[in-house]
């Protein structure tokens, strides 16, 4: 029995945990050289009990190219720009779907997905791929058709803002890690505070002109010591470093 593709309502948006966000947007146009398309071979969906060789249907037709952007001031509205973006996204979706649909039958099987991801350097266990397909396979035929693939694609692209927030958070965490390493350099005994003696020792080892005397180190610490305990904790150290570091206190 060959795979059937009944018309069904669009499946709910499902996050794809296996592909990095944005992967579909930066696949090169010449990816066909990496993923050769073997047209004409029959596919077998996991939900099928038997295999029947049929003529593959025509691959999804790409939508017309977006209209040329009007020059500034020519009256191109936000609606026109949005439509052009939608057309560009649809064209990209069709191109990427065709690359994964190795035999051009309008469906992506688990084997095709596994093989294509492997060639992209993203090996994924077969059982995980089967679970992913099951989550987005709205019609239950064991394959991913272009509509189901579109839901997957849109869920990835809709995460763009989240991705930016994620990158900003990663950068902040990376900066925090760097600052903690620097703090540990000053905090010689690891008690979570930088004392006058510890500050003087590090500044002397760095050959800086600041902090050559205990009184000078005490004055420098006093400029950033918010709680008045005569020491610098990590949060005080972080604020100071963002303001130029100990050298800015000289």
Swiss-Prot record:
Residue ranges of every copy of the EF-hand domain listed in the record: 88-123, 124-159, 174-209, 212-247
PROSITE patterns cross-referenced by the UniProt entry: EF_HAND_1, EF_HAND_2
Role description: Potential calcium sensor.
InterPro entries tied to this protein: EF-hand-dom_pair, EF_Hand_1_Ca_BS, EF_hand_dom, EF_hand_pair_protein_CML-like
Region Disordered: start-end pairs: 45-88
Protein name: Probable calcium-binding protein CML22
Top-level taxon of the source organism: Eukaryota
Residues annotated as binding Ca(2+) 1: 101, 103, 105, 107, 112
Gene label: CML22
Amino acids binding Ca(2+) 3: 187, 189, 191, 193, 198
Record Pfam families: EF-hand_7 (PF13499)
Binding site for Ca(2+) 2: 137, 139, 141, 143, 148
Source organism of the structure: Oryza sativa subsp. japonica (Rice)
Biased composition (Low complexity): 45-55
Residues binding Ca(2+) 4, per UniProt: 225, 227, 229, 231, 236
């Amino acid at each position: 029995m060959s795979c059937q593709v009944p018309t069904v309502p669009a499946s709910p948006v499902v996050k794809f945990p296996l592909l990095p966000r944005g992967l579909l947007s930066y696949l090169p146009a010449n990816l066909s050289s990496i993923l050769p398309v073997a047209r004409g071979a029959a596919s077998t969906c996991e939900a099928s009990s038997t295999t029947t060789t049929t003529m593959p249907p025509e691959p999804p037709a790409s939508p017309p190219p977006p209209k040329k952007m009007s020059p500034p001031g020519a009256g191109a509205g936000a609606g026109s720009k949005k439509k052009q973006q939608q057309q560009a996204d649809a064209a990209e979706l069709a191109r990427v779907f065709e690359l994964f649909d190795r035999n051009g039958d309008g469906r992506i099987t688990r084997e095709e997905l596994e093989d294509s991801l492997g060639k992209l350097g993203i090996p994924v266990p077969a059982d995980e791929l089967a679970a992913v397909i099951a989550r987005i396979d709205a019609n239950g035929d064991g394959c991913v058709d272009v509509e189901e693939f579109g839901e997957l694609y849109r869920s990835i692209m809709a995460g763009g803002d989240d991705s930016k927030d994620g990158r900003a958070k990663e950068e902040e965490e990376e900066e925090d890690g760097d600052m903690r390493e620097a703090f540990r350099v000053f905090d010689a005994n690891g008690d979570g505070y930088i004392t006058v003696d510890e500050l003087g020792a590090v500044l002397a080892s760095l050959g800086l002109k600041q902090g050559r005397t205990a009184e000078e180190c005490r004055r420098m610490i006093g400029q950033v010591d918010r709680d008045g305990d005569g020491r610098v904790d990590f949060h005080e150290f972080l604020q100071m470093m963002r303001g130029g570091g100990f050298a800015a206190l000289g």
